[in-house]
């Protein structure tokens, strides 16, 4: 088996393919017990009903992945099963899993796309299938090409009376007022502590509809009170998967709604559910907790088990990371809706995506799909826009600026898309030099300069563009720091590398902001996130250990021990206080390699399944909370707690997920190395039992 997996990876592109295998959603989906059980139940009901009617059940499984659904079909009594899987390493793994479960003679595995499958005697399929089971869906339901795949299958691979599992999908939309979500989409005016406006947003930025990319998040984890529901959930689209004529690419539905309460319709929350069988006995919902049909029953079940942990409301319902919910931003209305006011929700989809609009009446001209026209939503991520709008963060920076800048200050800004750096130019300094190597980001910043009539700014398209004569006049170097290429917060240590290269040109007296960055770790018990890395073992009675080995093997080659996750979406309980790992100083000794070692201690090692890691940026040498910008918890964590940790919603943190139980003493040795040549940080956590 090992050679087979390695050969598959080598044939298809080495490291990138190993990374794809290691980070694929196959294991995550297999951990979704509700999905598994409801697919299993729908297969049992569908096949039993066919047999009761005197018909055979010939099953086609498109995108079989691990082979789980095909094996369920055999167990449910299917007369034949054909499974197709185009991702070759996964297909090879499915072949071995099917054999390990003794079904190699009953399931025909076709290692190609369903659109390439042939039907007829001696071909991929001996006959057309009268049962189709598949899960071609993503958060947006149709984003992975479900419409085209179903249409092709109905035309070429399935009988006219085919029964599909799932039978039908329904898309729901809920209109909301949500300032938090809007802060990830729309830039705000930047003001100082006295309320004086420093930067106004150009109109072309304020009215831009933003990125067309789906914004998928765990809606159930939005902080309490962060949104105002303006409508009940509205069913806007239905997809009957067995009806070719209904699976069209382009549709517009207009739904008359009445506002439940007053507010601005800023966004639509979207999710979908699946009616798994034709009779409608089995329903699989992806709704957030407040709209989930089984929320109250599941909450009661949890409260009856006597757990002392305060589980967040959103974690009573089944967890999944492959099918989340999504946020769609609405074109802005200038006046709010009043309670009881009638309005029209416009829902659109093409072959791959959804979008929405609102109006006081039905529209004759359809709303086109959104795309960014201002550049900001191309140059910056949504979480970065959230950072730019973070009032507490901005206040700390601006208060510090007022302390350290003067009318003689010449400020070099080594961050990309830094409105704070631009704001410094409005605070009375002599000049601001903005490092902006990205052409799109530079044009975005130029729009702010022009709209706000900022005169004392010069752009540097590269570090080499800084002339020695001008470098000699610089009094302050400032960075947030932020670079669009950064995935983990400490990837922004690239700032130190830029600073190191410019040092020979800068005066010895230059003030460096931030002065240092400190990495911290927190041992935690994730409620659900650990499942993306947890071994499967058996799943619904089938042995999937071979899949564990496949993912484990390729993770060894491809994975960093720390990955980026927005931890506000994935609740966790702290099992100890915060541990300082390493501090990187930008004022001195940045060029020197650093190695730190230590141990994490937890009192309940059986609960430990992850380590959260983040960085704090210290604007000066004081390490005062008032001059520290943290990408970590909102409140310092000093000890274990049965209350979930509250995380900053505008950052991704680092996560190390554990696959083994630590020793009984509850200690995990760690080491962290900083390489100044690459501006990289390397982590090692020794999970072996001692």
Swiss-Prot record:
A Pfam family matched in the record: PrmA
GO molecular function: histone methyltransferase activity; protein-arginine N-methyltransferase activity; protein-arginine omega-N symmetric methyltransferase activity
Classification via InterPro entries: Arg_MeTrfase, MeTrfase_PRMT7, PRMT_dom, SAM-dependent_MTases_sf
Gene: Art7
Keyword Membrane: no
Alphabetized CDD domains for the sequence: AdoMet_MTases
Domain of life, source organism: Eukaryota
Cross-referenced PROSITE patterns: SAM_MT_PRMT
Protein name per its UniProtKB record: Protein arginine N-methyltransferase 7
Entry's EC annotation: 2.1.1.-
The organism of origin for this protein: Anopheles gambiae
Keywords: Methyltransferase, Repeat, S-adenosyl-L-methionine, Transferase
């Amino acid at each position: 088996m090992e050679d087979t997996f390695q050969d598959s990876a080598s044939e298809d592109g080495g490291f990138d393919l190993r990374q794809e295998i290691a980070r694929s959603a196959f294991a995550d989906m297999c951990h979704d017990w509700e999905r598994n059980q409801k697919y299993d139940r729908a297969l049992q009901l569908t096949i039993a009903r066919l047999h009761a009617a005197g018909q055979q059940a010939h099953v086609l499984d498109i995108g079989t992945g691990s082979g789980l659904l095909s094996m369920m079909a055999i167990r449910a009594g299917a007369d034949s099963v054909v499974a197709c899987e185009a991702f070759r390493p996964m297909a090879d793994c499915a072949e071995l899993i099917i054999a390990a479960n003794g079904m190699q003679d009953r399931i025909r595995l076709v290692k190609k796309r369903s659109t390439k499958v042939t039907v007829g005697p001696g071909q991929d399929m001996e006959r057309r299938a009268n049962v189709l089971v598949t899960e071609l869906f993503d958060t947006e339901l149709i984003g992975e090409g479900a419409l085209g795949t179903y249409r092709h299958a109905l035309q070429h691979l399935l009988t006219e009376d085919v029964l599909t599992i799932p039978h039908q999908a329904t898309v729901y939309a809920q209109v909301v007022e949500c300032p938090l979500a809007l802060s990830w989409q729309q830039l705000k005016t930047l003001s100082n502590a006295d309320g004086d406006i420093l930067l106004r947003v150009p109109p072309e930025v304020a009215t831009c509809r933003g990125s067309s990319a789906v914004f998928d998040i765990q809606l159930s984890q939005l902080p309490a009170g962060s949104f105002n529901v303006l409508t009940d959930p509205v069913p806007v689209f239905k997809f009957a998967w067995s009806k070719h004529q209904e699976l069209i690419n382009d549709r517009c539905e207009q739904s008359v709604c009445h506002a439940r309460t007053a507010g601005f319709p800023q966004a639509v929350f979207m999710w979908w559910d699946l009616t798994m069988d034709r009779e409608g006995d089995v329903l699989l919902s992806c709704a957030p907790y407040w709209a989930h049909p089984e929320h109250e029953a599941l909450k009661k079940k949890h409260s009856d088990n006597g757990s002392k942990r305060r589980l967040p409301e959103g974690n009573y319902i089944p967890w999944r990371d492959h099918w989340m919910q999504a946020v769609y931003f609405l074109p802005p209305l200038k006046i709010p809706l009043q309670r009881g006011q009638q309005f029209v929700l416009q829902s659109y989809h093409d072959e791959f995506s959804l979008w929405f609009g609102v109006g006081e009446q039905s529209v004759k001209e359809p709303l086109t799909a959104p795309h960014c026209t201002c550049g900001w939503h191309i140059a910056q991520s949504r979480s970065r826009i959230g950072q730019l709008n973070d009032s507490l963060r901005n206040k700390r920076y601006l208060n510090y600026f007022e302390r350290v800048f003067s009318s003689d200050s010449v400020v070099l800004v080594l961050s990309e898309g830094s409105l704070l750096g631009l704001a410094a130019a409005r605070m009375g300094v002599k000049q601001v030099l903005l490092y902006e190597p990205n052409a799109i980001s530079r044009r975005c910043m130029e729009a702010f300069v022009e709209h706000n009539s900022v005169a004392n700014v010069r752009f540097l398209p590269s570090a080499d563009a800084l002339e020695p004569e001008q470098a000699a006049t610089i009094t302050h170097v400032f960075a947030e720091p932020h670079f669009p290429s950064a995935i983990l917060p400490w990837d922004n240590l690239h700032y130190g590398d830029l600073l190191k290269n410019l040092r020979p040109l800068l005066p010895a007296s230059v003030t460096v902001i931030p002065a240092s960055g400190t990495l911290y770790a927190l041992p935690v018990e994730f409620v659900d996130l650990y499942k993306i890395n947890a071994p499967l073992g058996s799943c619904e009675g089938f042995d999937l250990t071979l899949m564990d080995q496949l993912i484990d093997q390729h993770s060894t080659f491809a994975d960093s021990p720390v990955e980026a996750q927005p931890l506000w979406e994935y609740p966790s309980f702290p099992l100890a206080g915060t541990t300082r790992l390493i501090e990187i100083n930008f004022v001195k000794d940045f060029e020197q390699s650093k190695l730190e070692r230590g141990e994490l201690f937890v009192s309940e090692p059986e609960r430990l399944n992850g380590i959260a890691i983040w960085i704090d940026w210290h604007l000066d040498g004081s390490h005062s909370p008032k001059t520290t910008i943290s990408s970590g918890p909102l409140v310092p964590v000093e000890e274990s707690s049965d209350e979930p940790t509250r995380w900053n919603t505008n950052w991704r943190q680092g996560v190390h997920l554990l696959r083994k139980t630590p020793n009984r003493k509850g200690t995990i040795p760690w080491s962290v190395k900083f390489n100044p040549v690459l501006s990289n940080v390397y982590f090692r956590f020794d999970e072996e039992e001692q």
